[in-house]
Curated annotation (Swiss-Prot):
Mn(2+) 1 binds at residues 146, 174, 178, 280. The lineage of its organism: Eukaryota, Fungi, Dikarya, Ascomycota, Pezizomycotina. Keywords: Arginine metabolism, Cytoplasm, Hydrolase, Manganese, Metal-binding. It comes from Neurospora crassa (strain ATCC 24698 / 74-OR23-1A / CBS 708.71 / DSM 1257 / FGSC 987). GO terms for molecular function: arginase activity; manganese ion binding. Its EC number is 3.5.3.1. This is Arginase. Substrate binds at residues 176-180, 187-189, 233, 294, 325. The gene is aga-1.
């Protein structure tokens, strides 16, 4: 990855790519009674878990989010998924940095910063996710900033359409709507635009600027649900209203409670639709997840975040999970914030993949 997207401090957290991609150990461990017995509706290999570790920060300007996959893995997440929840892990033990896809010069295009790098990397991610999803595996992607969801959702949408002839639904858990178009964005950071490209509200003909996105990569706005919103740009509010997109803000959660919100969210999607869960850790209140690039006070508790993940798992419809925007380099020296944010991220993933309290 070019120096413009990663600094030396962030690189210290990232495992150096191995010269050969060593396969992950695929033998499942014991579940010790901790894994939910929910039967998957849409996965032919529900105990097989495809892992994509994405060390990429080019969708925004703060270095360090590319260090998250290594921090999550070093904290024992993959070992927990294998030995405690009984998954067979597929993929490799490399955190992908995609340095070969990041051009030396990447001037803005239509107000987008690093457009070629983000387009190139998300196209590769789409291919990686698709390679797992087409085999009927559940796919877990560890980011990385939220621009990577252009790739993860495109890959799972394409695979599900090919394998089952169905469209996916997306539950987007985030403080932000990330549905700016290049023209409505105030910052030009693409991590605030992925949903507009995934729904076709923003598009490009040129391959180097997301022109690789085709109809089979895209998501219907009718199958999109937001949870946890509390920092939404004026242009995004207009987009949400004009397109009738289902969105539950923190006001809705305060008013109805997270249990009722999840009932309404899942009722909107329906029980016959594969679900891709994309979870930005900044959906949590900074009390629980301070080490993230755009924290916003007044967010979800960790227990509410875990509950969202548990509810999605209990549907039996989950086909893919993203965890994004953990930034372990933002904490001050001797600050426990990075550790707590990584712990929170691991908890969210485990709950989405079936960890139960009893």
């Amino acid at each position: 990855m070019s120096p413009s997207l990663v600094d030396n401090h962030a690189a210290a957290y990232i495992a150096a790519p191995s010269s050969a991609k060593a396969p992950m150990i695929q033998k499942p461990g014991n579940t010790f009674g901790m894994s939910s017995p929910i039967e998957s509706k849409f996965l032919s290999q529900p105990r097989d878990l495809g892992i994509v570790a994405v060390g990429f920060s080019g969708g925004q300007c703060k270095p360090g989010v590319d260090a998250a996959p290594s921090a999550l893995i070093e904290s024992g997440l993959l070992t927990q998924l294998r030995e405690e929840l009984g998954y067979r892990l597929h993929g490799d033990d490399e955190v992908h940095l995609y340095t070969d896809l990041v051009p030396k010069e990447d001037p803005p295009h239509r107000n987008m910063k690093n457009p070629r790098a983000v387009s190139n990397v998300t196209k590769r991610i789409a291919e990686q996710v698709h390679s797992h999803a087409k085999e009927g595996r559940l796919v877990l992607t560890l980011g990385g900033d939220h621009s990577i969801a252009i790739g993860t959702i495109a890959g799972s949408a394409k695979a599900i359409k090919e394998r089952l002839g169905r469209e996916i639904a997306v539950i987007w858990v985030d403080a932000h709507a990330d549905i700016n178009t290049p023209e409505t964005s105030g910052s030009g950071n693409i991590h605030g635009m992925p949903v507009s490209f995934l729904t076709g509200l923003a598009s490009e003909d040129k391959e180097e600027f997301f022109g690789w996105l085709k109809p089979d990569h895209l998501l219907s706005v009718k199958k999109l649900v937001y949870i946890g919103l509390r920092d939404v740009d004026p242009g995004e509010k207009r987009i949400l209203r004009e397109n009738g997109i289902k969105a539950f803000s923190m006001h809705d959660i305060d008013k109805h409670g997270i249990g009722r919100v999840m009932e309404m969210a899942l009722g909107h999607i329906g029980n016959d639709t594969p679900i891709h869960l994309s979870f930005d850790v900044d959906a949590l209140d900074p009390m629980w997840a301070p080490s993230t690039g755009t924290p916003v006070r007044g967010g979800l508790t960790l227990r509410e975040g875990d509950f969202i993940c548990e509810c999605v798992h209990e549907t039996g419809s989950l086909v893919a999970v993203d965890l994004v925007e953990v930034n372990p380099t933002l904490a001050a020296p001797n600050d426990v914030g990075a550790h707590e944010t990584v712990r929170a991220g691991c908890s969210l993933v485990r709950c989405a993949l079936g960890e139960s309290l009893l």
